[in-house]
A protein has these predicted regions:
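Class I S-adenosyl-L-methionine-dependent methyltransferase module
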Residues: 2-187
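Conserved class I S-adenosyl-L-methionine
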Residues: 248-271
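A short glycine-rich, Lys/Arg-flanked "PGG" loop and its adjoining helix->strand segment in the class I
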Residues: 229-243
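Core SAM-dependent methyltransferase catalytic element
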Residues: 269-295
Length: 295
């Protein structure tokens, strides 16, 4: 995050995309050098020792992102030619997408290799911390395969930056909102509003680092937590939240519903949650949940 903030401060929009890996580039080392002095000493030491991650694009520096990079470069070519991958990303109607998926993409070789590469064993070895599966329910590969069909048929892959990133290693013409040109100056002008802390989220509450919470994006934090610990965290957050505050989070392999765990403090918003989930371009999750804090 600190390097991304420095990149917004120090680079043009096109150079930001190059450093992130959204666009091909051979100049990432020099782009990093322009951001380096805007980093703390700890962040400089971290990135100075990881030039290979910079050369690959800092957007792919995480373990899960590197896992997808292996998939695009080493696994996918075993079952689909580059031309087929690019054809998948051509704009089509929903019936045309279904036709292409069923007759060109969803081959027996694709399904077999996908189930191996996205099995719990391989995913735990290369892509996720093994603790991710402690509370998981069901087959990871089967879940992801079903979600892939949703992303490639129900949604339009030609305008999905995450599909393009996973399959080609770049975002193509479609970018995540935070990287779009029309938002670049707005983000740059408000970078001073950001804070980052290397702490458990519970510590942020206990140390009075927040006054009142209006909104909380909890990502997929509950994938790594037991039901009791999830309920305890939600109670702590609710105690620091204004009435009407909203918590948003994703479920992938661990079903967690805050309003069920904490019915006296949280109200489910099923219609909003479902509408956003069906449109979510981050397609590998099983559910997207929005809860509202009760008075």
């Amino acid at each position: 995050l600190e390097l991304r903030v420095a990149a917004y401060r120090s680079l043009t929009h096109s150079d930001l995309l190059a450093l992130m890996g959204s666009r091909p580039s051979t100049q990432r080392a020099s782009l990093y050098a322009r951001c380096r002095l805007a980093l703390s000493a700890d962040a400089r030491r971290f990135w100075d020792a990881r030039s290979e991650l910079i050369d690959a694009g800092i957007g792919a520096a995480g373990k899960f992102e590197r896992y997808f990079r292996i998939f695009a470069r080493r696994v996918l070519p075993l079952v689909h030619r580059r031309r087929t991958v690019l054809e998948l990303l051509v704009p089509r109607s929903a019936p045309e997408r279904a036709e292409f998926y069923d007759h060109q993409w969803d081959t027996a070789a694709w399904r077999a290799l996908f189930r191996v590469f996205f099995s719990e064993t391989v995913l735990g070895w290369l892509g996720r911390d093994p603790s991710f599966f402690r509370y998981a329910e069901g087959s990871v590969a089967d879940h992801l395969l079903a979600r892939v069909r949703h992303a490639l048929v129900v949604l339009d892959p030609s305008v999905n930056p995450y599909v393009a990133w996973i399959l080609t290693g770049t975002h193509g013409e479609s970018l995540p909102h935070a990287l779009r040109a029309e938002h670049f100056e707005t983000i740059r002008e408000h970078l001073d509003r950001l804070e980052w802390h290397q702490l458990p989220i519970e510590a942020v509450v206990h140390r009075d680092m927040v006054d009142r919470i209006d909104r909380a994006n909890l990502s997929d934090i509950f994938e790594y937590m037991s039901e009791d610990n999830s309920a305890a965290l939600l109670a702590q957050l609710a105690s620091r939240s204004r009435p009407g505050a909203r918590f948003a989070y994703w479920n992938m392999m661990v079903p967690r519903l805050g309003a069920s765990l904490l019915p006296m403090r949280l109200r489910a918003m099923p219609e909003l949650s479902r509408r956003l989930f069906l449109a979510d371009k981050a397609f590998f999750y099983r559910d997207f949940v929005v809860d509202e804090v009760l008075p």
